[in-house]
Amino acid sequence: MSWYDALFPHLAAMGQERWAEQLQVTLSESQLLQRYGDMPGWLSALQALPELHPSRIALQDTVTIGSGADLCSVTREDLILGLQAFHPWRKGPYSVFGIEIDTEWRSDWKWERLLPHIQPLAGRKVLDVGCGNGYHGWRMRGAGADFVLGIEPFLVSVMQFQVMQRYLRDPRHHVIPIGIEDVPPNPACFDSVFSMGVLYHRRSPLDHLLELKGCLRPGGELILETLIVEGGQETIFMPPGRYAKMRNVWFLPSIAALTLWLQRCGFTEIACVDATRTTCEEQRATEWMRFESLADFLDPDDGGKTMEGHPAPLRAIFTATKP
């Protein structure tokens, strides 16, 4: 397994030789097989995908790999079955040799909301925390990022990334199966750090903000997306139990409260650049994600509330700078 051979020199060139050495052990085939009992099945599914060569690649406005004309002797139905083996597809959409992977989330909508407000990514080294299957990382590369490292603890998402890498073969975009807690403290080597859909899952959100800050070089930019609630600086909602059927939701601050958190953590140039109510057009079940989705999490009689009676999901995007 040579997925990460190109990763280690990039990290070493960023002054992270020791981290690169640690990851060579953590990401070795033997270690991954030991950590993940279902890894052999995923590897078999990956190897069963056809060898195809895309006639075109587009990452700027979409994530498009090849066209239907590239399939040659491979049938469209066989490729669909191969891709469906990696269900559920949550982040996207992707177009793969003419097959439209209609994912649960229209992640391209979030990208369009944030892109006009962040520092240009051209030439930047980016860390994407909780990156899922790497969809936004591909969009970052399309926007000119020099190097993108995604960290994602869920193996199915990492394997979906490897599906795309099978055809894109990009040595400057990697998704590795670790969490933020596995990143060495204060590497201070990334120009941009993204954390989207992570903060509300952390028992200690301020510690998470400090971890993100430690990953940035001085002058680097944090792009933070999270669930919020309406209210003033003292408004922070902690669900007494589940939130939208999720067990692991801890703190939902107001815009003003999260601004204060970022200030107390030492960030400057803090701005909330977008706040958008999540709709069932942006997050929904599809043939590529056949489990429950947003419509099942909301009060059927009041779309402004979750089924538990809490405020329905409202997501904000913040930018902030490490001085």
Swiss-Prot record:
<comment type="function">
    <text>Catalyzes carboxymethyl transfer from carboxy-S-adenosyl-L-methionine (Cx-SAM) to 5-hydroxyuridine (ho5U) to form 5-carboxymethoxyuridine (cmo5U) at position 34 in tRNAs.</text>
</comment>
<feature type="binding site">
    <location>
        <position position="196"/>
    </location>
    <ligand>
        <name>carboxy-S-adenosyl-L-methionine</name>
    </ligand>
</feature>
<feature type="binding site">
    <location>
        <position position="315"/>
    </location>
    <ligand>
        <name>carboxy-S-adenosyl-L-methionine</name>
    </ligand>
</feature>
<dbReference type="InterPro" id="IPR027555">
    <property type="entry name" value="Mo5U34_MeTrfas-like"/>
</dbReference>
<dbReference type="GO" id="GO:0016765">
    <property type="term" value="F:transferase activity, transferring alkyl or aryl (other than methyl) groups"/>
</dbReference>
<comment type="subunit">
    <text>Homotetramer.</text>
</comment>
<dbReference type="InterPro" id="IPR029063">
    <property type="entry name" value="SAM-dependent_MTases_sf"/>
</dbReference>
<keyword id="KW-0808">Transferase</keyword>
<keyword id="KW-0819">tRNA processing</keyword>
<protein>
    <recommendedName>
        <fullName>tRNA U34 carboxymethyltransferase</fullName>
        <ecNumber>2.5.1.-</ecNumber>
    </recommendedName>
</protein>
<dbReference type="GO" id="GO:0008168">
    <property type="term" value="F:methyltransferase activity"/>
</dbReference>
<feature type="binding site">
    <location>
        <position position="200"/>
    </location>
    <ligand>
        <name>carboxy-S-adenosyl-L-methionine</name>
    </ligand>
</feature>
<feature type="binding site">
    <location>
        <position position="110"/>
    </location>
    <ligand>
        <name>carboxy-S-adenosyl-L-methionine</name>
    </ligand>
</feature>
<dbReference type="GO" id="GO:0002098">
    <property type="term" value="P:tRNA wobble uridine modification"/>
</dbReference>
<feature type="binding site">
    <location>
        <position position="105"/>
    </location>
    <ligand>
        <name>carboxy-S-adenosyl-L-methionine</name>
    </ligand>
</feature>
<feature type="binding site">
    <location>
        <position position="130"/>
    </location>
    <ligand>
        <name>carboxy-S-adenosyl-L-methionine</name>
    </ligand>
</feature>
<comment type="similarity">
    <text>Belongs to the class I-like SAM-binding methyltransferase superfamily. CmoB family.</text>
</comment>
<dbReference type="Pfam" id="PF08003">
    <property type="entry name" value="Methyltransf_9"/>
</dbReference>
<dbReference type="InterPro" id="IPR010017">
    <property type="entry name" value="CmoB"/>
</dbReference>
<feature type="binding site">
    <location>
        <position position="91"/>
    </location>
    <ligand>
        <name>carboxy-S-adenosyl-L-methionine</name>
    </ligand>
</feature>
<feature type="binding site">
    <location>
        <begin position="180"/>
        <end position="181"/>
    </location>
    <ligand>
        <name>carboxy-S-adenosyl-L-methionine</name>
    </ligand>
</feature>
